[in-house]
Amino acid sequence: MVLTVTDLACARGPAQVLSGVSFSVSAGEALILRGPNGAGKTTLLRTLAGLTPPLAGTISHAEDAIAYAAHADGLKAQLTVAENLTFWATIFGTLDIAPAIAAFALAPLADRPAGELSAGQKRRLSLARLLVTGRPIWALDEPTVSLDTENTARFAAAVEAHLRAGGAAIIATHIDLGLPNARSLDITPFIAKGLPASDPFADDPFLGAAL
């Protein structure tokens, strides 16, 4: 197993959102998080990524194993597409940005400042950063937002290649990405007692970015 979660309790601010969450993810496997809006998917991903401390339970994985992609793209607007990828590649100690550029068809945009990109182009660049992290576990929160059908397929292909290479992915998404070796986890049964699944304040979008 590359990640094991045991009896995890998660909170958003002072409010407990989830309790008793247990699952494991193996190398080469994708876990798709399901549940209604506000159920706690973002909170769970933030907790797995170490951005929010758990209230209880354990999360076991290798050190620095998780790359987290949040709702916001978190790009450096003044840097070009290539410079953004080079910046993150340097942070994570990797060198080659070419595979990331190729995977998301960013070559025609390589010299364009990120601040001048469309929403879909920004999303492609944000997701391309996953390929320069070198981290085996991808935790992804609604990663296909702003992507058209063609680029959603590109993203799915990138995840599939990551899985074939022995990586793993935990993805909160409402669409079928057609990934092999994917299974679903409905988090609705883990919603903390007394918190309605439809509570709009249970799990608002995270507006920062770990990547």
UniProtKB/Swiss-Prot annotation:
Subcellular location, record wording: Cell inner membrane
Any Gene Ontology biological process: cytochrome complex assembly
InterPro entries for the chain: AAA+_ATPase, ABC_transporter-like_ATP-bd, ABC_transporter-like_CS, ABC_transptr_haem_export_CcmA, P-loop_NTPase
The protein's Enzyme Commission number: 7.6.2.5
Subunit note: The complex is composed of two ATP-binding proteins (CcmA) and two transmembrane proteins (CcmB).
NCBIfam families: ccmA
Protein name: Cytochrome c biogenesis ATP-binding export protein CcmA
Organism: Jannaschia sp. (strain CCS1)
